[in-house]
């Protein structure tokens, strides 16, 4: 266990795992390398758009969207020094300025054509 894992709140456990899973799945299945950078979120937004254009049923992509949202949340946590919060099965990122962000919900909005994980991260990282 690394020092980072030891000090992370328990609310981070599931989203961190979902993010790691999507990084692995994209590397192995789509040959897309995600490196937890803000820049990588452009590729994530584009991938979600491609999935949407294929008209895949939501139920078929729900887990992938959750993974992409968790990945974006991890980018925000790493960029801003924020932390994951959880309640009632929902997960948010709280940035040091006290604002809350819902990257998993934003990934779902991306799938409907109304969101952007890249822009969410940009806004969350502004102080």
Q: Where are the language model's segments positioned?
A:
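A recognition module on extended beta-rich or small alphabeta surfaces enriched in W/G with H and D/E
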Residues: 93-127
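Generic preference for hydrophobic/aromatic residues in regular secondary structure cores
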Residues: 22, 34, 88, 93, ...
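A general marker of short, structured functional hotspots
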Residues: 32, 64-67, 107
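Generic structural signal for hydrophobic core residues of well-folded globular domains
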Residues: 48-51, 79-80, 111, 124
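Small-side-chain structural scaffolding
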Residues: 10-11, 15-20, 69, 73, ...
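N-terminal low-complexity, intrinsically disordered segments
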Residues: 1-62
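Enriched - but not universal
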Residues: 21, 45, 87-88, 95, ...
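Amphipathic, interaction-prone secondary-structure segments
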Residues: 55-98
């Amino acid at each position: 266990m690394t020092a980072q894992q030891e000090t992370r709140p328990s609310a981070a456990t599931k989203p961190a795992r979902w993010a790691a899973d999507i990084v692995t799945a994209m590397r192995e299945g789509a040959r897309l390398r995600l490196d937890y950078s803000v820049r990588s979120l452009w590729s994530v937004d584009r991938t979600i758009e491609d999935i949407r254009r294929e008209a895949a049923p939501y139920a078929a992509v729900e887990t992938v969207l959750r993974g992409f949202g968790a990945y974006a949340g991890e980018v925000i946590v790493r960029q801003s020094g924020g932390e994951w919060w959880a309640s009632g099965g929902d997960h948010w990122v709280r940035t040091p300025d006290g604002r809350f962000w819902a990257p998993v919900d934003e990934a779902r909005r991306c799938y409907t054509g109304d969101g952007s994980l890249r822009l969410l991260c940009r806004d969350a990282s502004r102080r």
